[in-house]
Amino acid sequence: MTLRIRTIARMTGIREATLRAWERRYGFPRPLRSEGNNYRVYSREEVEAVRRVARLIQEEGLSVSEAIAQVKTEPPREQPEAERLRERFWSSVGALEGDEVTRVLDDAQTVMDVEAYCDGFLLPLLREMGVRLDVAREHLASALIRQRLRQVYDALSPAPAGPRALLACPSGDHHEGGLLVLGIHLKRKGWRVTMLGADTPAAALQGACVQVRPDVVALSFVRARAPEEFASVLEDALRACAPFPVVVGGLGAREHLKAIFSLGAQYAESSEELVAIWNQVRNAQNRP
């Protein structure tokens, strides 16, 4: 199976422009040419190599060139447990075996800590299924993963004090997996989290802000939108959330950074970035 660069970007979280820059400078990843239309396509092995490079950069602090050099020179490895679990997941989803999918999710949770389970296992599966599954299988798989993320989220004890975050997907966004992962991270950092979930209209956001008075509102945009639609949805949300600071994230927001900043919101790709933005806002408010 081969995949286009846009698909690789969605699966790995690495932007298309970044992948093309790596290819020009380092010869990595290495594309093939599809028959008939001469498009650049990539093998599943290259996708896994890109993921390993990203992990080396993020987790071990290697530079891009160091990480790519290390991955290129890696000897063939035995298939790690996480990869075996992923293969079992896709196989059982393909067979529409919901009970077996549940067993795979149980097995993964047993051998992984919370961060590895949510960020390294469940969330990548959610991102990938949209480009490799038909509607029935995607519905089965995504429902089971969201259910599992919700269980992890609910199992975390609420903080008795600490900053408060209001989390929502805006109107029209029905995929809350990334939002749940953010909520898990914030709860583990001692935040009080109010989770509104998917497809939250502006009026509901406004009512929640009035009652909760959050320190920050986090909006997760997942689906692709035209620039005009994105700006309109965000403007409505910002009016509803005023005067509270709004941080935007999600795959559907990455292509609209100019609109996000020009409308007065902030952008974050992780809980760490969100917390850093909140600290900046708080420090600015406390200045004489």
Curated annotation (Swiss-Prot):
Residues 162-288 form the B12-binding domain. One of its GO terms (biological process) is carotenoid biosynthetic process. One of its GO terms (molecular function) is metal ion binding. Residues 5-24 bind DNA. Pfam families: B12-binding (PF02310), MerR_1 (PF13411). PROSITE patterns: B12_BINDING, HTH_MERR_2. Negative regulator of the carB operon in the dark. Binds specifically to the CarA operator, in the region around the carB promoter, which blocks access to the RNA polymerase. The N-terminal region interacts with DNA and CarS, and the C-terminal region is involved in oligomerization and binding of cobalamin. This is HTH-type transcriptional repressor CarA. It comes from Myxococcus xanthus.
